Amino acid sequence: MSYPLEEVNKRRTFAIISHPDAGKTTITEKVLLYGNAIQTAGSVKGKGSAAHAKSDWMEMEKQRGISITTSVMQFPYNNCLVNLLDTPGHEDFSEDTYRTLTAVDSCLMVIDSAKGVEERTIKLMEVTRLRDTPIITFMNKLDRDIRDPMELLDEVENVLKIRCAPITWPIGCGKLFKGVYHLAKNETYLYQSGQGSTIQAVRVVKGLNNPELDVAVGDDLAQQLRDELELVQGASNEFEQDAFIKGELTPVFFGTALGNFGVDHFLDGLTQWAPKPQSRQADTRTVESAEEKFSGFVFKIQANMDPKHRDRVAFMRVVSGKYEKGMKLKHVRIGKDVVISDALTFMAGDRAHAEEAYAGDIIGLHNHGTIQIGDTFTQGETLKFTGIPNFAPELFRRIRLKDPLKQKQLLKGLVQLSEEGAVQVFRPLLNNDLIVGAVGVLQFDVVVLRLKTEYNVEAIYENVNVATARWVECADGKKFEEFKRKNEQNLALDGGDNLTYIAPTMVNLNLAQERYPDVVFYKTREH
């Protein structure tokens, strides 16, 4: 069988990054709608309503109306197969989000046009920089009053340090929003609000100086558009494929996801310009997506995707080759061969058994505790994919039991949740405390909820005097022993038994780093 490269070349795997409430979940819905993957897009507003958005599905997400876990959706568009990885947009779910960004080939950045660049977007962009991921930008919420579009582009360029190439340009906004002009095609698409799952047929006016344009949008807005475009074409960047692929330039689209307008414009851009599945660095060599032999890595583990089955699913990005049902793969970390007969493909929460999957696809493996984040699977070769990071937590709590007899279940639950990346656990060397570290407050709630529902353990938190944590290593054994002896009260083991320095204050950490220049304090570590 020759390896069908056309299957790989059809794949586009991307994630959406945004600040909470910029409209990411709505965009996810509408993308699926345009990809015919769902018939009714559940707009995400009514938190108490029965129609929950398709990609939000764990219990707590249903209650809070936020996407906590990363789901994966696949849909066809423009002769491509698009894999969309939905990343948690809420303040608190960053570590999972960060890791998901290691499994995609491009990102869609969604910006609320009334607000501009916000703090979470800045953080997520920093993570995409680790791999120079190509970025497409969608300026959302044009059906509301927005900031000046030129100002928005300037802000993206100055704050996020990426050049902007506008592809479409808005005509009016809020109640006066009339549509967008496509710079490359010299066409105006007139806005008619489509709600829910109604996609309106779009009226197109050809040419910027077409008198029909003045009739359609009014003389004032037509003239304003021509004036603005003169400025834009003088001041902004042309789209360059090369610079886009290197992550130096972003094509910018304007629209309103809620009004079903503009979503197809950026999807056209994504399928036309975004890279097909890319090669990936492993510890021994670079693995190309065109290789025939299968390889893939686990970037996320999620518990209880199926309330009916108490199970965990490991999400694996296929890097090369083809997955076929029943194939034998080597689980490199433990050196064992496993037969994978029941991998899953996803349409957020609806599971289907995968018969086959190609480079760029995401498949789910049933996990009974043997798979960890960062694990590599191959068809026999011993290699490990790199670049799946653990991030030092920023928030810490001591966790203890209401019923002290369940200490064993608590530890088991915490270690499993830490392998899954839901939280990090630290066990100080000098006492029996259990310290939980997270990148956001909401993770603490999730852990208590899941300990209760999955492990039947009732736990409560107490404040703990920890400001930050760093993984520590030292090449000089003698100096490391001295460091460990003198700092025992600040040392702990994490869920994977890695030595960690737990600092009560940032000042304490800085002093320790000055005092022990041979010890390396890591803010991130490879899984």
UniProtKB/Swiss-Prot annotation:
<dbReference type="GO" id="GO:0003924">
    <property type="term" value="F:GTPase activity"/>
</dbReference>
<dbReference type="GO" id="GO:0005829">
    <property type="term" value="C:cytosol"/>
</dbReference>
<comment type="similarity">
    <text>Belongs to the TRAFAC class translation factor GTPase superfamily. Classic translation factor GTPase family. PrfC subfamily.</text>
</comment>
<dbReference type="InterPro" id="IPR000795">
    <property type="entry name" value="T_Tr_GTP-bd_dom"/>
</dbReference>
<dbReference type="InterPro" id="IPR041732">
    <property type="entry name" value="RF3_GTP-bd"/>
</dbReference>
<dbReference type="InterPro" id="IPR038467">
    <property type="entry name" value="RF3_dom_3_sf"/>
</dbReference>
<dbReference type="InterPro" id="IPR005225">
    <property type="entry name" value="Small_GTP-bd"/>
</dbReference>
<keyword id="KW-0648">Protein biosynthesis</keyword>
<comment type="function">
    <text>Increases the formation of ribosomal termination complexes and stimulates activities of RF-1 and RF-2. It binds guanine nucleotides and has strong preference for UGA stop codons. It may interact directly with the ribosome. The stimulation of RF-1 and RF-2 is significantly reduced by GTP and GDP, but not by GMP.</text>
</comment>
<keyword id="KW-0342">GTP-binding</keyword>
<protein>
    <recommendedName>
        <fullName>Peptide chain release factor 3</fullName>
    </recommendedName>
</protein>
<dbReference type="Pfam" id="PF00009">
    <property type="entry name" value="GTP_EFTU"/>
</dbReference>
<dbReference type="InterPro" id="IPR053905">
    <property type="entry name" value="EF-G-like_DII"/>
</dbReference>
<dbReference type="Pfam" id="PF16658">
    <property type="entry name" value="RF3_C"/>
</dbReference>
<feature type="domain" description="tr-type G">
    <location>
        <begin position="9"/>
        <end position="278"/>
    </location>
</feature>
<feature type="binding site">
    <location>
        <begin position="86"/>
        <end position="90"/>
    </location>
    <ligand>
        <name>GTP</name>
    </ligand>
</feature>
<dbReference type="GO" id="GO:0005525">
    <property type="term" value="F:GTP binding"/>
</dbReference>
<dbReference type="InterPro" id="IPR004548">
    <property type="entry name" value="PrfC"/>
</dbReference>
<dbReference type="InterPro" id="IPR035647">
    <property type="entry name" value="EFG_III/V"/>
</dbReference>
<keyword id="KW-0963">Cytoplasm</keyword>
<dbReference type="GO" id="GO:0016149">
    <property type="term" value="F:translation release factor activity, codon specific"/>
</dbReference>
<dbReference type="GO" id="GO:0097216">
    <property type="term" value="F:guanosine tetraphosphate binding"/>
</dbReference>
<dbReference type="GO" id="GO:0016150">
    <property type="term" value="F:translation release factor activity, codon nonspecific"/>
</dbReference>
<dbReference type="InterPro" id="IPR031157">
    <property type="entry name" value="G_TR_CS"/>
</dbReference>
<feature type="binding site">
    <location>
        <begin position="18"/>
        <end position="25"/>
    </location>
    <ligand>
        <name>GTP</name>
    </ligand>
</feature>
<dbReference type="InterPro" id="IPR009000">
    <property type="entry name" value="Transl_B-barrel_sf"/>
</dbReference>
<dbReference type="InterPro" id="IPR027417">
    <property type="entry name" value="P-loop_NTPase"/>
</dbReference>
<dbReference type="Pfam" id="PF22042">
    <property type="entry name" value="EF-G_D2"/>
</dbReference>
<dbReference type="InterPro" id="IPR032090">
    <property type="entry name" value="RF3_C"/>
</dbReference>
<feature type="binding site">
    <location>
        <begin position="140"/>
        <end position="143"/>
    </location>
    <ligand>
        <name>GTP</name>
    </ligand>
</feature>
<keyword id="KW-0547">Nucleotide-binding</keyword>
<dbReference type="GO" id="GO:0006449">
    <property type="term" value="P:regulation of translational termination"/>
</dbReference>
